[in-house]
Amino acid sequence: MRIKSIPTLFVALSLLASGGFAAEGKNLQVLPKDITKDELKKTMDGFAEQLGVKCTFCHVLEQYEKDDRPHKADARRMIKLVQDMKAKKAEYYGPRVKEAVITCGMCHRGKAEPEPFVP
């Protein structure tokens, strides 16, 4: 599944394999507070795919709103980074880069930790 629009990138991650998705977004600090359940699920699925992780990488099982996992704070910082990159796209990249390519996957490429470039 490819995400075409991540409303404000990166907080928690995807559906639990064992049992569904939180009904409502709680403790949303970076994503829009009025995000729909469907858009939140789509966004979380996108994060999971782009980083190759499951929900529990950032979330406490069945308590998505908790901030007990360090990766959740990291995720919020990374969402802000992507938001900034999108806001300053022309400054960073010029007209040749479309906003749609500025995602978590741009650097992570399916891995929780981006691999450094080695020439």
Regions found by a protein language model. Give the residues of each.
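Bacterial N-terminal signal peptides
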Residues: T8-S18
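Sequence context surrounding c-type heme c attachment/ligation sites in exported
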Residues: F21-P119
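Positively charged n-region of N-terminal signal peptides that target proteins for export
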Residues: M1-I6
